[in-house]
């Protein structure tokens, strides 16, 4: 599985602001009904406390979205939260799963609105299926950048993330990576095979390969350009 992983520093976002950002991202994240089920939230089964079922929600209804965010935040905090910071947990089912009988759930999680943290705490993750088309990855990345305005965002598998020696709060460098304007970035460290495109208040960096199998050699070059150490 691939994950689009991003984050940003202290930034106050209200419940309404988070709901608006979430809805804005839904407008552009591909929602092919032949491929994906509807977005929903996990709810405990009334007859079995150890079982959770995905309950679809109307992502176009602001009240429904804000209620979903509030419910997750209260569950995470074991009650109403008095300090800034909200939690978002959504998922949808991959319908054309051919890998087996077990369903594949693609999750969309975020922490937003946190302030006064010693280290960056605002964070988002969107899970994507293996073998996904590059154009879908690009659209999902752009949707998240425009909606959440992160400092950094990248798409990579867990193996690629580990192989590069990633440590928070570094950007996860993958086949496609976004960094916000003002981030340390030495373009002279890159070669001609790495494509840099300016858009959405920052730059998108594409390395050779595919979303599932990007060039690790070029990922290391991008990490050098960002001032990060590389794994041995």
What kind of region is each of these model predictions?
Residues 41-156:
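Internal, hydrophobic cores of structured domains that mediate oligomerization or house catalytic pockets
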Residues 1-47, 156-232:
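C-terminal interaction module
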């Amino acid at each position: 599985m691939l994950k689009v992983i991003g984050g940003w520093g202290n930034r106050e976002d209200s419940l309404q602001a988070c709901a608006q950002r979430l809805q804005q991202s839904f407008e552009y994240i591909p929602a092919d009904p032949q491929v994906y089920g509807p977005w929903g939230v996990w709810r405990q089964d009334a007859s079995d406390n150890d079982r959770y079922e995905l309950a679809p929600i109307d992502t176009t209804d602001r009240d429904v979205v804000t209620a979903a965010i509030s419910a997750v935040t209260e569950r995470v905090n074991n009650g109403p939260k008095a300090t800034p910071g909200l939690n978002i947990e959504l998922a949808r089912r991959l319908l054309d799963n051919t890998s087996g009988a077990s369903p594949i759930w693609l999750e969309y999680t975020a922490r937003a609105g946190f302030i006064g943290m010693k280290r960056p705490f605002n964070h988002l993750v969107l899970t994507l299926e293996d073998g996904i088309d590059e154009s879908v990855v690009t659209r999902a990345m752009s949707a998240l950048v425009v909606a959440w305005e992160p400092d950094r965002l990248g798409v990579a598998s867990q193996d690629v993330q580990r192989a590069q020696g990633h440590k928070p709060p570094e950007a996860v460098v993958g086949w496609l990576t976004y960094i916000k304007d003002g981030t340390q970035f030495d373009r002279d460290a890159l070669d001609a095979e790495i494509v840099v495109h300016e858009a959405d208040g920052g730059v998108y960096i594409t390395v050779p390969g595919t979303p599932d199998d990007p060039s690790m050699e070029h990922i290391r070059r991008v990490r050098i350009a960002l001032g990060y150490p590389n794994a041995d």
